[in-house]
């Protein structure tokens, strides 16, 4: 090339030319702290890379959407119209017991193991001991309900008589007036009326036994006598005590008969004696069928000798009677027999020796 290439401009000069072309306002921009030695930097030496930008903030974790069909806790089966009265220990070996008491007239509550029956006074505490072999799940409860024992009354609801219902008889104020069974000393007791059967029940939370004890005691009160008109009216009742899980499912069941009376010890003694007299048969005593007895044979007539048979002859007239009597005596004397004894009410002339003592018979002498 003929023409010589123009020498390249220094980078500094190029920058200064460009800087002078900027408006004055741009030249007043603040410079970095190391602006005094910026020219000493090599044009080919790269500056420090800028710090990486901070990572974007992570989005907040959104709450998991609720499931479409959340699991529901198990529910209790609907209450049957005729509840079962069969004992059922279940997987937890559910049992009940009672405090040992005699048959004294002063006792307020006594239990008969022979009859499986509780005798108690009106509105007096009846301690029931609850035992389990395996601890039930937390949240379990005990439910008590009364039903009539006989089949013709089992569909009816056991309730108090109108008299005791008006009288009330409860200091806690939690139990409805018509409920027969109440719990004493437990503020957690809840009283229910079944929507289907209209039966009354009381529920208390299950509490494990204390240290050194093998049972939990619940105090039940029965608020009406068994003989009250308009209430139980002498109809026997059963108390069904059930152990229920947190969802109301049945875990165990125990039943016992209850009689509310004025003298529990006396009534227990009488009923146990009657039970033994019936031969220990449970429930209603059935009379044992006696073997058929043969009809008694009619008594056989004894065949007598005609000569020894006695006959009776009716005679009219005293004279004729005396004459026939003398003939009869003469015949007996001829046969070597004794004369017949005179009958009472008839005066007969006695002939013979006079008695040795006492009054002597006066005989008329023959002149």
Swiss-Prot record:
Annotated spans, Disordered: 30-84, 275-303, 333-367
Residue numbers marked as site, Interaction with DNA: 105
One Pfam family recorded for the sequence: P53_tetramer
Free-text comment on the cofactor: Binds 1 zinc ion per subunit.
Stated role: Multifunctional transcription factor that induces cell cycle arrest, DNA repair or apoptosis upon binding to its target DNA sequence. Acts as a tumor suppressor in many tumor types; induces growth arrest or apoptosis depending on the physiological circumstances and cell type. Negatively regulates cell division by controlling expression of a set of genes required for this process. One of the activated genes is an inhibitor of cyclin-dependent kinases. Apoptosis induction seems to be mediated either by stimulation of BAX and FAS antigen expression, or by repression of Bcl-2 expression.
GO MF annotation list: DNA-binding transcription factor activity, RNA polymerase II-specific; metal ion binding; molecular condensate scaffold activity; promoter-specific chromatin binding; RNA polymerase II cis-regulatory region sequence-specific DNA binding
Stretches the record annotates as Oligomerization: 308-339
Description of how the protein assembles with itself and partners: Binds DNA as a homotetramer.
Keyword vocabulary terms for this entry: Activator, Apoptosis, Cell cycle, Cytoplasm, DNA-binding, Metal-binding, Nucleus, Phosphoprotein, Transcription, Transcription regulation, Tumor suppressor, Zinc
Segments of this protein annotated with the region Transcription activation (acidic): 1-30
Motif (Nuclear export signal): 322-333
Protein name per the record: Cellular tumor antigen p53
Homology family: Belongs to the p53 family.
Binding site for Zn(2+): 161, 164, 224, 228
């Amino acid at each position: 090339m003929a023409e010589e290439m123009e020498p390249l401009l220094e980078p500094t000069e190029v920058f200064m030319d460009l800087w002078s072309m900027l408006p004055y306002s741009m030249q007043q921009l603040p410079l970095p702290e190391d602006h005094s030695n910026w020219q000493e930097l090599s044009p080919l030496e790269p500056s420090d890379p800028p710090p990486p930008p901070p990572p974007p903030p992570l989005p907040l974790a959104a709450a998991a959407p609720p499931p479409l069909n959340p699991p529901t806790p198990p529910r209790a089966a609907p209450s049957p119209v005729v509840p079962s009265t069969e004992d059922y220990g279940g997987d937890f070996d559910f049992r009940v017991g009672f405090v040992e008491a005699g048959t004294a007239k002063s006792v307020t509550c006594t239990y008969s193991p022979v009859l499986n029956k509780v005798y108690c006074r009106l509105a007096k505490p009846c301690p029931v001991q609850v035992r389990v072999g395996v601890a039930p799940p937390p949240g379990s409860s005990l439910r008590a309900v009364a039903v009539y024992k006989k089949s013709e009354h089992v569909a009816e609801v056991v309730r108090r008589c109108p008299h005791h219902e008006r009288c009330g008889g409860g200091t806690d104020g939690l139990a409805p007036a018509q409920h027969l069974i109440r719990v004493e000393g437990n503020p957690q007791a809840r009283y229910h009326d079944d929507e289907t059967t209209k039966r009354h029940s009381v529920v208390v939370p299950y509490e494990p036994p204390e240290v050194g004890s093998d049972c939990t005691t619940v105090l039940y009160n029965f608020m009406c006598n068994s003989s009250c008109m308009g209430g139980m009216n002498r109809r026997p009742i059963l108390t069904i005590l059930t152990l229920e899980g947190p969802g109301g499912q049945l875990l165990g069941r125990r039943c016992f008969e209850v009689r509310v009376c004025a003298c529990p010890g006396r009534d227990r003694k009488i009923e146990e004696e009657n039970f033994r007299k019936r031969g220990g048969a449970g429930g209603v005593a059935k009379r044992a069928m006696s073997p058929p007895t043969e009809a008694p044979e009619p008594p056989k007539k004894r065949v007598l000798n005609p000569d020894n048979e006695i006959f009776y002859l009716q005679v009219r007239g005293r004279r004729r009677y005396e004459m026939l009597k003398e003939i009869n005596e003469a015949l007996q004397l001829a046969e070597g027999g004794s004369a017949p004894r005179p009958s009472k009410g008839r005066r007969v002339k006695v002939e013979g020796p006079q008695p040795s003592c006492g009054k002597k018979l006066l005989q008329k002498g023959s002149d």
